[in-house]
């Protein structure tokens, strides 16, 4: 993933003071979550730049090699082994380049939030375990840590434990709820503050979830 990622950008007002970089799930693209921005916004919030990158197109092993947009290859059904580690690492690096671009525009890391759904969430959580950047927070929707054992053994940089909003469907057939619960447990053990939500839905996003996420974002923006 040596080329810069193409992105969809939505600025809520001129001169953004904050940025949210939001990664989509397998087979989707950067347009997938762009429509929810108006559902999250509160009138008193500062200007925010939402950045929705497109993942590169690549063959996906579990889907018989059919090419689609993906942050990494999925090798099988076993959640302990399914993620292509090199692909995850490459996407973490590409995400870092997006963060650097926002910093270059004048938004400090302390005012940048990372969000991701499914595969996208797996990438932002993996990044949080590797980076020493003081990111403002993580939004992990219907997702998991690709290498849970490695995460459990991780040594997170001192003080670099941003707050995490996690939400998951109780009837998710793609990423079972138990896998997400295990991920939340490991993150808590590592010292990440977790706000956890579970909803009676499948592999999706619901209105109640967006309301809770808006409340969480409100607290993050007010704390700065």
Over which residues does each language-model region extend?
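Alpha/beta-hydrolase-fold catalytic nucleophile elbow
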Residues: 53-54, 115, 139-142, 167, ...
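Short helix-capping segments at alpha-helix termini
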Residues: 41-46, 106, 131-134, 188-192, ...
């Amino acid at each position: 993933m040596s080329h810069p990622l193409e992105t969809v950008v939505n600025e809520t007002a001129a001169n953004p003071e904050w940025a949210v970089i939001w990664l989509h799930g397998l087979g989707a693209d950067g347009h997938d979550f762009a429509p929810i921005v108006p559902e999250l916004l509160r009138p008193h919030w500062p200007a925010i730049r939402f950045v929705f990158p497109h993942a590169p197109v690549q063959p996906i092993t579990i889907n018989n090699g059919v090419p689609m947009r993906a942050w990494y290859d999925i090798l099988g059904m076993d959640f302990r082994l399914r993620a292509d580690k090199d692909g995850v690492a490459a996407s973490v690096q590409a995400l870092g380049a997006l963060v650097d671009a926002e910093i270059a525009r004048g938004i400090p890391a302390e005012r940048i939030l990372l969000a991701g759904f499914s595969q996208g969430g797996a990438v932002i959580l993996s990044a949080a375990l590797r980076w020493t950047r003081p990111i403002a927070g993580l939004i992990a929707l219907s997702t998991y840590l690709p290498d849970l054992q490695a995460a459990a053994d991780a040594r997170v940089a001192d003080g670099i434990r941003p707050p995490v909003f996690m939400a998951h469907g109780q009837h998710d057939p793609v990423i079972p709820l138990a896998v997400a619960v295990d991920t939340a447990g490991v993150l808590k053990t590592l010292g990440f503050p977790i706000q956890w939500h579970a909803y009676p839905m499948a592999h999706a996003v619901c209105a109640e979830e967006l309301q809770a996420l808006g409340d969480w974002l409100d607290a993050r923006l007010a704390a700065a």
